[in-house]
UniProtKB/Swiss-Prot annotation:
Keyword annotations of the record: ATP-binding, Cytoplasm, DNA damage, DNA recombination, DNA repair, DNA-binding, Nucleotide-binding, SOS response
Name of the protein this chain belongs to: Protein RecA
GO molecular function, one term: single-stranded DNA binding
Organism: Delftia acidovorans (strain DSM 14801 / SPH-1)
Disulfide bonds: none
Family: Belongs to the RecA family.
InterPro entries for this protein: AAA+_ATPase, DNA_recomb/repair_RecA, DNA_recomb/repair_RecA_CS, P-loop_NTPase, RecA-like_C, RecA-like_N, RecA_ATP-bd, RecA_C_sf
Function: Can catalyze the hydrolysis of ATP in the presence of single-stranded DNA, the ATP-dependent uptake of single-stranded DNA by duplex DNA, and the ATP-dependent hybridization of homologous single-stranded DNAs. It interacts with LexA causing its activation and leading to its autocatalytic cleavage.
Main location: cytoplasm
Length: 367
């Protein structure tokens, strides 16, 4: 009986090898492989969102590259601000970014205040939804762009709708456009390691008795193809005296294919400045016991950095290197990806480079 089982297994192995050889001959080497070999398994490369709390909520330290991301929420909730912060973070890593401004409403001076280098950002203001998605497809296929933002799905108007009369009924046209585009884009996005962020708006479904009446525009395709979906909401207003200086914001990770979903993050968005990263570093640094808080004073490594949250936040803003050092210690304590330091590399990358340099010099790396 054992001989029969062995023979059957041997026949199956031969049949499998023949099938694999036929597939590789027809479609090219590397078309199919075992999951544990080659480059099939690799660490997820991420880009920080500009918010430490949101990076932690995402579970991997930021938004994953080579994936489709959807960010949606009500009007003036911080959707474009969040994506501009991600562009600024990608530029810090030396990445090339493109912004498809279908809404024709990008405020370039505000983007500059958030740290975006306008000279290094590609921008397009397309006339139709088809044109916008063709531009995205061309940029992704080039392999030279690291991140593309589409603002917004709701503004991707099909050509037939633009050329038709006002009031024409064209049901499902935008949903079909998005479905076709995402079918074409997904595989190329993965191969070129390009992150594509779609900003989306909220609509209300009529006649919903149970559950949430809210839905996003553009049909269901984006919900399926997106690896990460973020629901961003404004929860309150930050005031200095009687003057409003920012918004309190809450983000829920509604879908996450790279880590457990449904985690939330809360942070402040200050008008004209963007996400208050230093405030988050203070709060999480204290929680992780990396910063000491005694009364109103904040201290790091026994040295006082400010009395009161506002003063300590201002100190970290003026000393960005120290802020990155503290943030990386918080990230390390939580086991998520570290930020690049002033030299452009995360600490573990610097260590690897140092090891390689020593190997080149000595011919061997000491254990």
């Amino acid at each position: 009986m054992n001989t029969a089982v062995t023979t059957a297994n041997s026949e199956k192995a031969k049949a499998l090898q023949a099938a694999l050889a036929q597939i590789e001959k027809q479609f090219g080497k590397g078309t199919i492989m075992r999951l544990g070999e080659g480059e099939a398994i690799q660490d997820i490369q991420v880009v920080s969102t500009g918010s430490l709390g949101l990076d932690i909520a995402l579970g991997v330290g930021g938004l994953p590259r080579g994936r489709v991301i959807e960010i949606y929420g009500p009007e003036s909730s911080g959707k474009t601000t969040l994506t501009l912060q991600v562009i600024a973070e990608m530029q810090k890593q030396g990445g090339t970014c493109a912004f498809i401004d279908a809404e024709h409403a990008l405020d370039t001076s505000y983007a500059q205040k958030l740290g975006v280098n306008l000279n290094e950002v590609l921008i397009s203001q397309p006339d139709t939804g088809e044109q916008a998605l063709e531009i995205v497809d061309s940029l992704v296929r080039s392999g030279a762009v690291d991140m593309i933002v589409v603002d917004s799905v709701a503004a991707l108007t099909p050509r037939a709708e633009i050329e038709g009369e006002m009031g024409d009924q064209l049901p499902g046209l935008q949903a079909r456009l998005m479905s076709q585009a995402l079918r074409k884009l997904t595989a190329t996005i993965k191969k070129t390691n390009c992150m594509v962020i779609f900003i989306n708006q909220i609509r209300m479904k009529i006649g919903v008795m149970f559950g949430s009446p809210e839905t996003t525009t553009g049909g269901n395709a984006l919900k399926f193809y997106a690896s990460v979906r973020l629901d961003i909401r404004r929860t309150g207003t930050i005031k200095k005296g009687d003057e409003a200086i920012g918004n309190e914001t809450k983000v829920k990770v509604v879908k996450n294919k790279v880590s457990p979903p449904f985690k939330t993050a809360e942070f402040d968005i200050l008008f004209g400045e963007g996400i208050s990263r230093e405030g988050e570093i203070l709060d999480m640094g204290v929680n992780a016991k990396i910063l000491d808080k005694s009364g109103a004073w904040y201290a790091y490594n026994g040295e006082k950095i400010g009395q009161g949250r506002d003063n300590a936040r201002e100190f970290l803003r003026e000393n960005s290197g120290l802020a990155v050092e503290i943030e990386n210690k918080v990230r390390d304590s939580l086991g998520i990806a570290l930020l690049p330091t002033a030299g452009g590399d995360a600490p573990e990358a610097k260590a690897a480079k140092a090891g390689k340099a020593k190997a080149d010099k000595d011919g061997v790396i000491e254990a």
